[in-house]
Amino acid sequence: MWYTSTRGMAPRVNFEGALFSGYAPDGGLYMPEELPRLDKETLRHWSTLSYRSLVKELCALFVGLELIPRHDLNGLIDQAFSRFRHRDVVHLCKLKNGLNILELWHGVTYAFKDLSLSCTAQFLQYFLEKKKKHVTIVVGTSGDTGSAAIESVQGSKNVDIIVLLPKGHCSKIQELQMTTVVKENVHVFGVEGNSDELDEPIKAVFADVAFVQRHNLMSLNSINWSRVLVQMAHHFFAYFQCTPSLDMHLLPTVEVVVPTGAGGNLAAGCIAQKMGLPISLVVAVNRNDIIHRTVQKGDFSLCEVVRKTLASAMDIQVPYNMERIFWLLAGSDSQTTRALMEQFERTQSLHLPKDLHSKLSEAVTSESVSDEAITQTMGRCWEENQYLLCPHSATAVSYHYQQTDSGQPSSIPRCCLAPASAVKFPEAVQAAGLTPETPAEILALEHKETRCTPMRRGDDWTQMLRDTIEALSLRWKGCVENTAE
């Protein structure tokens, strides 16, 4: 399996090359050159599998067994999911009035990113051990990615991780999950800015290809293909869990509602669709609605500011995985994708060509949800089911309630993806007039030592990041030389 840049100006790479990259050298994102097409018999067989086994089957298609033999691949995925709290890893909760919630948050940090990052970290370690290499991972987070990435690699001897978090823009628990990991290979920066602003120095560093190669830099944000690959399993599992039967001639459709920030889960769903999974996708966003405007009007343009909302992990204006979706729906047309993205980067405004907007509208529908609707949805779900939603999951369930209240019940099953547990967002739970449930391990974070380096407005964030990376490379080089002696 080969991977190509969405912008078409970088050499193709295998899975290992895509895994160890951030952006491609031409500024694009890696995508498979060809997507396998799944027939009905394969889908029927996969419908009998556990979530864990589904991930194994999907990864076997995209990793390349010459790189990771199947026996090793299975072992890595088993190890990745060994610390999840639910024996099934992912759990479907069936509530009243056709409300199906796929809980993706049973990992260590109570967020869906544990699923893809635990696997990605295992793949990294596999290649690093073989080659005796060191990498420095750079991650920008709006809340959940940072803690899941830290958790997946903390204590690793051949990985350093640098995380930039938006100070004051994520929940207190999210921040503590990052700043309380006081390990030699974990380096957390608190940025005086929002998640889009902290992405700028990261993108600037990755744009220096020689610097990236010299210091073995990589990203674990959802620009990393491995993240998107594992997230495809959410859609397959949601489909199989909500389909009454696959015995009919025409496979039934399931509607999957995807709360989205940077668009990794949405890109994964679009790829699953292209592979033959009969799902209808709905993207749910908060008031930072660039994806909603793109789907509805073809308007891929920045607003003046990122709006602070209760669904803070989705407070994003630049959903970079839309580039993957544009490329996919444009029929792998890298020339068109490159022209579109270069215009967006230049002007921060883009109107999709009519044919591309038409294809996007066919593949995806969308909904933008206010804070008021989020708290109302959280309250209603508790009242009807005694079930606590996180504010991000509530954006998906809000769409479900809109549809059921309209008096036109869906003729197809609907599954709402739940990306995080309500335990991470006590502030939002209280705003909904509900009582937070906080596990002992979360309460204990309050009393732990913290470590976080400030990145203040007026500081040169890019230079601070470069200096940190260079210092880590020097330290690793010193360790290797000492070991050799």
From Swiss-Prot:
This is Threonine synthase-like 2. The keyword Lyase applies. Acts as a catabolic phospho-lyase on both gamma- and beta-phosphorylated substrates. Degrades O-phospho-threonine (PThr) to alpha-ketobutyrate, ammonia and phosphate. The modification N6-(pyridoxal phosphate)lysine is found at residue 113. It comes from Rattus norvegicus. The keyword Mitochondrion does not apply. GO terms for biological process: 2-oxobutyrate biosynthetic process; serine family amino acid catabolic process. Its EC number is 4.2.3.-.
